[in-house]
């Protein structure tokens, strides 16, 4: 029988993007607030949006960053890196260029002290296999993000899982993104549309349309996905709000994934990191559109001892509530869910460091 997991509480600074872009806080200020407000001990950061000149990181800056993390009492969990094969205007990266591009980011993660690099779905099985020895050399686990409109049992994800099994490297795995298993259209986004003048009739039909697709489950293929996207656009147009159509489609099909919680069991042994994506907390102190309690229970029951980075995506549209208050409330739900599952979340720094070190593979003498 699998021992119950004790996930590590954490947050990604992506949750505070509005405050960062509004220059309420710089990177250091956000890190200090994360520690002071008890959102850690786990800390996740996005490389390109947080570190000037990334992935080029000099020794002095890396030293300053590591010292800051130690000073405030956090533990680095995951560095979100990019796998954008379209960085050139006129062509896509070839395989060799992609490996070089990713290698620079893996080295940066190691230099900054991150044990995980979150990579994106544009990385295919051949590339992940080629990157495995590079990840091993630098002691960085590559955790590909399973993000809506993908889901755990999607053919592309299963192909990666099967390749991981073939390669046999403990440095390859997945980042579980809760946005793939959403159970309702986010009420906070409905409120944002209301504030943009959408009629109650239109908003009701948006929710009804999403609920219909939820009952059907994930799209069968890209054609089905495209049809769903188009139906949101058509709905907006019929109600005289074509300006909202693309937004409905992006969120309805690419942010709120309709897979079921149990779908994650398909790749559970390969989940190395978790994005605890959510969109808001209601008046009852619960997340009304993401089954947080069921997701935490599944992780606990599967012996998950890695970090959960609370990832508040509602900042894109919710300008009237504090993201810091919302993160605090959502993490309370996670802790309550872990206790209800017979376990707990790790909030102690020393425990988190020890547990994360045991959870992830390491390479003796790994260096940047």
Swiss-Prot record:
Keywords: Carbohydrate metabolism, Lyase, Metal-binding
Residues of the active site: 147 (proton acceptor)
Broad EC category: lyase
Catalytic activity: 3''-dehydroisovitexin = 1,5-anhydro-D-erythro-hex-1-en-3-ulose + apigenin; 3''-dehydroisoorientin = 1,5-anhydro-D-erythro-hex-1-en-3-ulose + luteolin
Gene3D superfamilies: Divalent-metal-dependent TIM barrel enzymes
UniProt xrefs under InterPro entries: IolE/XylAMocC-like, Xyl_isomerase-like_sf, Xyl_isomerase-like_TIM-brl
Pfam family, one: AP_endonuc_2
Recorded effect of pH on activity: Optimum pH is 6.0.
Required cofactor names: a divalent metal cation
GO molecular function terms noted in the UniProt entry: lyase activity; metal ion binding
Thermal properties: Optimum temperature is around 40 degrees Celsius.
Sequence positions that bind a divalent metal cation: 145, 177, 275, 311
Presence of the UniProt keyword Transferase in the record: no
Lineage top rank: taxon: Bacteria
EC number(s) stated in the UniProt entry for this protein: 4.1.99.-
Subunit structure: Heterodimer composed of an alpha subunit (CarB) and a beta subunit (CarC).
Known function: Carbon-carbon bond-cleaving enzyme which participates in the metabolism of C-glycosides. Acts on the C6-glycosylated compounds 3''-dehydroisovitexin (3''-oxo-isovitexin) and 3''-dehydroisoorientin (3''-oxo-homoorientin). Shows weak activity with 3'-dehydromangiferin (3'-oxo-mangiferin).
Name of the protein in question: C-glycoside deglycosidase alpha subunit
Lineage: Bacteria, Bacillati, Actinomycetota, Actinomycetes, Micrococcales
